[in-house]
Design a protein with these regions (language model features):
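Conserved, mostly hydrophobic/aromatic
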Residues: 57, 114, 135, 195, ...
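Glycine-rich active-site/cofactor-binding loop and its immediate structural neighborhood
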Residues: 109-145, 149
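A gly/proline- and charged-residue-enriched helix-loop-helix capping module
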Residues: 137-158, 164-175
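Alpha/beta enzyme core
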Residues: 180-312, 328-330
């Protein structure tokens, strides 16, 4: 006689229910209504989105979820992954899988990187410190958002992280002011500067504007600087490759340029001294190009020709997404919204759970494709759909 299932925890019950044919017969609205109440219940990182929306006030959720204009680029970032299919393998011993990558002489356990964020929301208002603790536990590289550093100095973040973090810079036309920040970060022991160049004044963030109508609270009641009002933003349309050269000449840190989508821009960045490129459209928040970064990535990789490492972000939700980006030539990938969902709903435990799920899925897909190391993931590992 078969042993009855053990329902000693809610998680085990949910797993049993998910395997039942009755579950697949439920109407879509019934499946969408369930919201996880703790990180351990999550089956994938997408389940943290609804939990975050439930936890956040309308304006905060609007800031976290908005794109620009009609959110076409925001949607394209996810839809783009469907343009590529995996070439799975069989009868390959994948008992031992090495997911590690090396970036500027430092070895990391996975190619998954925590992207910077201007504003973070969490139950205990710990923000980037909670993210740093989760990054330390999961041994993940963290990029500290420059706006976050104003409330949590980089040395505090490094202490919570247990090691160096990279720093995201929003340079302004007041170069002396920019250099004060650069020198402070360099003296703190930051090895890499990530210069973000894709945010110009006048963006049309319609989603957040709509949801702000439903929220009468003052921004100062929950965070010191209202989103998108950081000093110097209005001056960023005056920056050029001369700014990049001045940055490179003024610091010993490696300088990556984040926000590149066009191969011509990528080539010019390398010619003007960039140590790396991050292909990014700011999560669909920069401009309404309507194009996914996963589709821009191969063009950038081709023109860079291995002169510098190329990273990519936007739309990553699955281990398969990570695999596809590496096959297209990315050295590593950055995730943003998923860990921010985890943070908003459950604090550092939510961030840690998101990272653990992404790591587990990536490990699994490497095994399914017969890969023992990241170096074995090549363009031949995927096919254009």
């Amino acid at each position: 006689m078969p042993k009855p299932p053990d329902f000693h925890s809610r998680r085990h019950f949910l797993k049993f229910l998910a395997a039942s044919p009755l579950f697949s017969a439920l109407p879509p609205q019934a499946l969408q209504e369930y919201i996880i109440s703790n990180p351990a219940e999550a089956i994938n990182v997408l389940e943290f989105e609804a939990a975050a929306r439930k936890a956040l006030p309308p304006a905060h959720w609007g800031y976290l979820s908005t794109g620009v204009d009609d959110d076409a680029t925001l949607r394209a970032n996810r839809e783009g992954f469907a343009h590529y299919q995996l070439r799975t393998r069989r009868l390959v011993d994948t008992t031992n899988i090495d997911m590690s990558v090396e970036l500027f002489g430092t070895k990391w356990e996975t190619p998954i990187v925590l992207a910077p964020s201007g504003t973070l929301f969490d139950p205990k208002n710990e923000g980037v410190i909670a993210v740093a603790r989760a990054a330390q536990k999961q041994k993940i590289l963290q990029i500290l958002g420059g706006i976050q550093e104003r409330s949590h100095p980089i040395d505090e973040v490094m202490k919570a992280r247990g090691g160096p973090v990279w720093y995201q810079l929003y340079a302004t036309q007041q170069f002396d002011s920019t250099m004060q920040t650069v020198k402070k970060i360099e003296q703190a022991g930051c090895p890499v500067l990530v210069w973000t160049v894709d945010i110009l004044p006048g963006r049309n963030l319609e989603t957040v504007q709509r949801l702000r109508r439903l929220d009468s609270r003052e921004c100062s009641s929950c965070h010191p600087t209202p989103p998108n009002t950081a000093p110097g933003r209005a001056a960023r349309n005056t920056l050029t490759y001369e700014t990049l050269r001045r940055l490179k000449d003024s610091t010993k840190m490696k300088v990556l340029v984040k926000g590149i989508e066009n191969p011509e821009d990528a080539d010019l960045c390398v010619q003007n001294g960039a140590d790396g490129i991050i292909v990014s459209n700011h999560g669909g928040r920069a401009s309404e190009s309507g194009r996914a970064t996963i589709d821009s990535l191969p063009e950038v990789v081709q023109v860079v020709r291995n002169r510098v490492p190329v990273l990519v972000d936007d739309g990553f939700r699955r281990g398969t997404d990570v695999f596809k980006a590496l096959a297209l030539g990315a050295r590593a990938i950055c995730i943003g919204r998923p860990y921010m969902w985890g943070l908003a709903a459950f604090g550092d435990a939510g961030v840690e759970a998101v990272l653990a799920i992404m790591r587990r899925e990536f490990n699994l897909i490497m095994a399914e494709c017969g890969k023992h190391s990241v170096a074995e993931i090549t363009p031949a590992s995927i096919i254009r759909a």
